[in-house]
Amino acid sequence: MAPTKDSVIHMGAESWDEISEFVTKKGHGVKGLSELGIKTLPKQFHQPLEERFSEKKILERASIPLIDMSKWDSPEVVKSICDAAEHWGFFQIVNHGVPLETLQRVKEATHRFFALPAEEKNKYSKENSPINNVRFGSSFVPHVEKALEWKDFLSMFYVSEEETNTYWPPICRDEMLEYMRSSEVLIKRLMEVLVVKGLKVKQIDEIREPMLVGSRRINLNYYPKCPNPELTLGVGRHSDISTFTILLQDEIGGLHVRKLDDTGNTWVHVTPISGSLIINIGDALQIMSNGRYKSIEHMVVANGTQDRISVPLFVNPKPQAILCPFPEVLANGEKPVYKPVLCSDYSRHFYTKPHDGKKTVDFALMN
């Protein structure tokens, strides 16, 4: 049941405590605020002027590369993928091998979870979840953000089938597991292309595999319609810290990618393509490639008329992995740009501050 105005906060209130009580502590999220029919965005969500998005920033008639993966190991496709990773950091793929029926079930399960009553979703909040690997929340890191983001999320870190069956929300668990299993072949193919063929790494052995794809995390993101979308963001400027991310988005749109080699502040809208998946390079692979592949700033704008969902699957190094350039990349005398960094330290650094563009990767720069 949707909350009523009488049951929650005075929307004219200035206190974060009232907003926090409703959004986070009671589990309504920003979806609950949207469902109240509020006409004015609470000031806690107002982004600084320099961070707000304008249509004037969009590079018209531009798009990220679209790649057909049906012949994924052909020289032409290998070149297209590696070029996209180097010059864009983002690309869309079709004929990727993940069944379209699986993708549809994932989207339906995402809507089912966020349609749950607040008290059910709140069972997975930071304060109530029985395990750290499953977390429902809003924004990014609210306790350190000066301006909150207009987004609710469910984050699930995969450890084992046993833990998943015990702790992941039953209303979406099976669909997310099916999606993760269906993505394994795609993940291996992308690693073969980007690392073995692109970076000339001899092989992905039992030592290197955990360094590249040692863990998985899946997020369910919900961006409700917003009364003043021009004042806030769904997600602020950032790059992912993953090796790479596989993103499923719905047909609404809203994801924008910063254009590389651009001296101005221009962005490219990632137009939804039915049946496609979006691949974006993460900081970890930028470090391991010594900067050849690029993790690119991206953001999600708020929408004033429609709700939006997305489901990123983060393919991450194992927390105990050491991030550093591959020796093969440096074999011809190339100087390392990045120092060795423990993956868990890098991740901890990312999650202790608000989204701030590409500044996280500076943590790994050589002194």
Swiss-Prot record:
Domain of life the protein comes from: Eukaryota
Record-listed Fe cation binding positions: H238, D240, H298
Regulation of protein activity: Repressed by the competitive inhibitor psoralen, but not by umbelliferone, xanthotoxin, bergapten and isopimpinellin.
Residue ranges annotated for the Fe2OG dioxygenase domain, each copy included: 207-317
Pathway(s) served: Phenylpropanoid metabolism
Expression triggers: Induced by UV-B in leaves and petioles, but not in roots and stems.
Known cofactor(s): L-ascorbate; Fe(2+)
Pfam families with a match to the protein in the record: 2OG-FeII_Oxy, DIOX_N
GO biological process, one term: response to UV-B
PROSITE patterns per record: FE2OG_OXY
Record-linked SUPFAM superfamilies: Clavaminate synthase-like
Sequence positions that bind 2-oxoglutarate: Y223, R308, S310
Catalytic activity: (E)-4-coumaroyl-CoA + 2-oxoglutarate + O2 = (E)-2,4-dihydroxycinnamoyl-CoA + succinate + CO2; (E)-feruloyl-CoA + 2-oxoglutarate + O2 = (E)-6-hydroxyferuloyl-CoA + succinate + CO2
Gene Ontology molecular-function annotations: 2-oxoglutarate-dependent dioxygenase activity; 4-coumaroyl 2'-hydroxylase activity; metal ion binding
The enzyme's E.C. designation: 1.14.11.61, 1.14.11.62
Keyword line: Dioxygenase, Iron, Metal-binding, Oxidoreductase
Keyword Oxidoreductase in record: yes
Cofactor: how bound: Binds 1 Fe(2+) ion per subunit.
Family the entry assigns: Belongs to the iron/ascorbate-dependent oxidoreductase family.
Function of the molecule: 2-oxoglutarate (OG)- and Fe(II)-dependent dioxygenase (2OGD) involved in scopoletin and umbelliferone biosynthesis. Converts feruloyl CoA into 6'-hydroxyferuloyl CoA, and p-coumaroyl CoA into 2,4-dihydroxycinnamoyl-CoA. Has no activity with cinnamic acid, caffeic acid, p-coumaric acid, ferulic acid, cinnamoyl-CoA and caffeoyl-CoA.
The name this protein goes by in its record: Bi-functional coumaroyl CoA and feruloyl CoA ortho-hydroxylase Diox4
Protein source organism: Ruta graveolens
